């Protein structure tokens, strides 16, 4: 099968949707299919050989964060040329309503089109304003996928049409085989955090407040952080009690992230909202690391209602401290959580998820057997 995939977010900055697109493409290629990906990126961005850069993107506030998106006449022309140069059996668009390449491809293309919705954010004012304009293009979508029940609910309630729920995938073996970083595991307890630590919804202030309560019982406690943000701002926020206990790796490649997850005693996701899934939880679970996470609906579903990890009330540092203490002070509980987490993660392995996506492609092609081309 010849598959075209469009990612709306720039590959110049790592993100969950970008990782999903690349991992899905690799899994499908491993199954013998031809896959080409189009995404915002400049010519100097390191990319897999199956990803074609569509030019630099602009940083735009979107979905409670800042996304790097590509839109305008130059991007439109590049999308048209890409579709014209390939003879795809199916076109797979991620986040087709984001003002970027996926929406442009939806405007340009005709034929079997599959759309995946990642976000759980309800309809924005901008989408309300352009709903009438967008609706004819949304009706071109042949089949829809939502990565979570929350994303599916947004699709059904605000965009019309149902969606098949297929979760994000994870390369379980990649994380399971990762070796700890040099100097790890330590004698004292180490908490792990991955993400843009200066972004409020990622919950770093909640985690720092919880750590302050643990220092009396755990004087050797440290925090290993992987992600983007201002290191000086983080240390100032941590204060004199915690600043020297933070090991900051900065933005890291996948191998370093996997090794970091394998190095810590517990992975903490203190997020306060805006999450539709929680792929980082699965990555930590695949690495054999116990997870403590906010009791967000998306995280609860990934953690199997708390069977595969510990959930704590959102935004409550006292409760988070108690949850972390309960895991860090009990080796048997850590081992049990690690085993349950590994079991749960196996259900999300890309070998399973890619097969589910492929069946949606087959359904879309059966409904519209034309090859993908430019709309007249």
Functional labels for PLM-detected ranges:
Residues 150, 169:
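Carbohydrate-associated surface elements
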Residues 183-202, 208-212, 224:
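Conserved donor-binding/catalytic core segment of Leloir-type glycosyltransferases
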Residues 266, 290-293:
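Short hydrophobic beta-strand element within catalytic cores of glycosyltransferases
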Residues 305-306, 310-317, 326-332:
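Conserved acidic donor-binding segment of nucleotide-sugar-dependent glycosyltransferases
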Residues 41-42, 194, 222-235, 250:
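Glycosyltransferase donor-sugar binding loop
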Residues 7-14, 21-22, 26-74, 228-231:
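N-terminal strand-loop element at the rim of the active site
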Residues 234-258:
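Nucleotide-activated donor-binding/catalytic signature segment of Leloir-type glycosyltransferases, i.e.
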Residues 319, 326, 333-347, 358-359, ...:
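A short, well-ordered alpha-helix in the C-terminal region of glycosyltransferases
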């Amino acid at each position: 099968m010849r598959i075209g995939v469009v990612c709306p977010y720039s590959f110049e900055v790592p993100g969950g949707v970008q990782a999903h697109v690349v991992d899905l493409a690799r899994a499908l290629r491993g199954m013998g299919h031809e896959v080409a990906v189009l995404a915002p990126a400049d010519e100097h961005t390191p990319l897999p050989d199956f990803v074609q850069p569509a030019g630099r993107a602009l940083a735009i506030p979107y979905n409670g964060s800042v996304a790097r998106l590509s839109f305008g006449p130059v991007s439109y022309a590049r999308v048209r040329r890409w579709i014209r140069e390939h003879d795809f059996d199916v076109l797979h668009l991620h986040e087709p309503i984001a003002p970027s390449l996926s929406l442009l491809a939806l405007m340009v293309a005709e034929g079997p089109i599959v759309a995946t919705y990642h976000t759980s954010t309800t309809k924005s004012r901008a989408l309300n304003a352009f709903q009438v304009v967008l609706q004819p293009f949304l009706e071109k979508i042949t089949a829809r996928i939502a990565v979570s029940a929350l994303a599916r609910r947004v699709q059904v309630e605000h965009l019309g049409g149902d969606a098949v729920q297929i979760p994000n995938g994870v390369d379980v073996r990649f994380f399971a085989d990762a070796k700890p970083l040099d100097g790890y595991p330590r004698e004292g307890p180490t908490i792990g955090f991955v993400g843009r630590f200066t972004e409020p919804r990622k919950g770093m202030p909640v985690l720092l407040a919880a750590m302050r309560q643990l220092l009396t019982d755990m004087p050797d406690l440290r925090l290993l952080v992987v992600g983007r943000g201002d290191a000086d701002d983080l240390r100032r926020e941590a204060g004199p009690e915690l600043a020297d206990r933070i090991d900051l790796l900065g933005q890291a490649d996948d191998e370093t992230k996997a090794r970091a997850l394998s190095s810590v005693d517990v992975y903490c996701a203190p997020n306060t909202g805006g999450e539709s899934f929680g792929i980082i939880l699965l990555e930590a679970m695949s690495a054999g690391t116990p997870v403590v996470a906010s009791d967000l609906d998306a995280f609860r579903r990934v953690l199997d209602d708390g069977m595969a990890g510990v959930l704590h009330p959102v935004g409550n540092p006292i409760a988070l401290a108690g949850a972390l203490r309960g895991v860090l002070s009990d080796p048997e509980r850590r081992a049990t959580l690690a085993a349950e987490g590994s079991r749960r993660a196996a259900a999300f392995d890309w070998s399973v998820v890619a097969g589910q996506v492929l069946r949606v492609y087959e359904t879309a092609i059966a409904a519209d057997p034309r090859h993908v081309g430019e709309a007249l």
